[in-house]
Structures are given as structure tokens and as C-alpha cells.
């Protein structure tokens, strides 16, 4: 799944000399949590999160009056609070790669740049969640079950043969390999004839491996 299929392309960005006051307003007006900072050529030079804005803003306990606070927010620039040289991804990178980068670096979004380093989009944890929902077929309903099978070539074939026998339409298949030499297969299907057909299917799956759960 390439990032380009899931990223936001209509990206709100700012220049390095944009005031903190304007950055905060843009976040509020567009309901976003991060804004890339770009130079005159459109290349990404930084990123600002809503936390950066909060940390740089005067606290409620400040002794500054309203005019002093407004002056401070107007004078503080994006370049003063941004994270410089942020981690970026390419449109051709996968969503899985982007998710791993976000997880490992504890960030909620990544600018997407082309080969010249110019901003072409942004992908967030929210976009990753949407991709996951689509991959798993969660919106399509049906029956989902998980089965534990040996992590060996050919062990999944009897399962697919069984699904074919019951005329089950496969919506998604995900696998996770465990350290104990087994793998968990998460399968979502639909178009089974009735409840009895579902019960017969799960009984057959249980003969192939250990059924971990089954639910609609």
C-alpha cells in the first residue's frame, strides 16, 4: 500500500518566518495537529506540532498582560519552534513503513516529499488507522476468525480449500508469526449461507489448527 494512496495532499504549510500566532490559528481553523515548514522552493525544512505551539506559548500563570502576550506570539517565528530536518517519507514508500517510522520515533505524522525534497503531502496516524480499517475489511462486516497454524510452507492451503468448499468470500487475510514457531491467521469472510454453515466452517477450521476467536 503506497503512501500516495493514503496521504493528505491538500497540505497546510508555513514558511520559516510565519508567526507563532498565525501557526496556532491555522491549526485551529483547519483542525490539524501538525504543520510542515517549507522554504521558498517548497522543500521541507521543519515541522511544527500542536505540542510545540503549546510549549512555546505563555502559560496561563504568566504575568504578561494581553498586549505583551500578543507581541510575544507575533514575534516568535516558526523557525524558532519547529523541529528541523524532520523525518520524511516518499509517496512510493508503503504505509507499513510510515507506520513503523512513526512508532519507532514516537511521532504522529510525517511529511511526504518527492525526489527533490519538495512537500507533496502528509501522512498521519489517523491515515494509518483508516488504511488498517480498509485492509482488515472491518467496514464490510462478515465473520472474522483467528486460527493458529504451524509456520511452515503449505499449512494455509487446507484452510483456503475449506473456505472454497463453503463458498465463503474472503474479505481479508492477515498473518502474524510468533516466536514459538506458529503463526496466527486472521481471516474475514462473508456470504456464508446461514448460521449452520458458519458453525460447520469453524468446526472444520478447528480441525486444521487452534481457533483463537470467532466473531461478527
Please name every model-derived segment.
Residues 33, 108, 169:
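Short acidic/polar active-site loop segments enriched in Thr and Asp
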Residues 27, 35-52, 102, 110-126, ...:
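A glycine-centered beta-loop-beta connector
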Residues 1-52, 57:
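Basic, Lys/Arg-rich alpha-helical nucleic-acid-recognition elements, primarily the DNA-binding modules
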Residues 183-192:
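Short basic, glycine-rich beta-strand/loop surfaces that mediate nucleic-acid
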Residues 206-216:
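Short, charged, intrinsically disordered terminal tails
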Residues 1-10, 50-87, 94, 99-103, ...:
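Tandem CBS (Bateman) regulatory domains
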Residues 177-184, 215-216:
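Short proline/glycine- and acidic-rich turn/helix-capping motifs at secondary-structure junctions
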